[in-house]
Amino acid sequence: MDGMLRRRGGVIERLLHDGDAPVLVRVAQPEPRRVVFGARAVSREAAAYGIARMRFALGVDEDLSGFRRRFARDPLIGPSLRRRPWLRVARRPEPFEALAWAISEQLIEYERAAAIQRRVLAVLGRRWVGWDGAPDGLRDLPATSVLAGTEPALLESLDLAQGRALTLRRAAREVARGRVDLHGSDHEAGWRRLRAIPGIGSWTVEMLALRGQGRHDQLPAGDLGLLKLVGRLLSGGDPRALASESQVRAFFAPYGEWAGLAAAHMIEL
């Protein structure tokens, strides 16, 4: 709904960046067990980077056989797992994208957050310009250095709340200056530094981890959908019941390192 992904026929298109180099990635699935990736960029290195990030976003290289074997007969997620063994967590190609959009989605309904995201892309986003010099319409998130220098008042004019505008700029500054390495292997170190920023709590970091860093063990337990789901299940079906965050964590504890993926299967119950 943010407009960053475009579908033309059976092909999806996405604009990404390897540093400052734009990469247009196209993905198609001509057969059930075959996915084809292609990219246009100024260098082979940039094209390879864009393809790698889209492979991550779509989870095509993940081995979920252990998850399927372990939980195929689970009374809660087993039916979904048998019906949709291909289901993956909805990921973002870039971890900062997952972080930035999680900040924009805090405490508001998703439709409003998506509208804010579209405005950010329209005003600040990077555009794909075709080889003929004409704009193509695809946009990518602005560079972290751009967001780090954006006045909060401009972000507020796009309907981002004042506190979240400040949080987004501070997070972008930490990443742009290299103090937080979202692509690094030590995720926890980055999370600790991000948690020191006012406005970034457990839910935001867990959304980054799950959707931007591929951490299936991370569960955004404060998510309203999960609070409602677990509340309903624990109450015997009361649609108005809300669980606590600690109850959500306890509920998903049996799924261990797969808690985030288990939640993706369970959220539609």
Predicted segments, located by residue:
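HhH-family (HhH-GPD) DNA N-glycosylase catalytic core used in base-excision repair
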Residues: 1-269
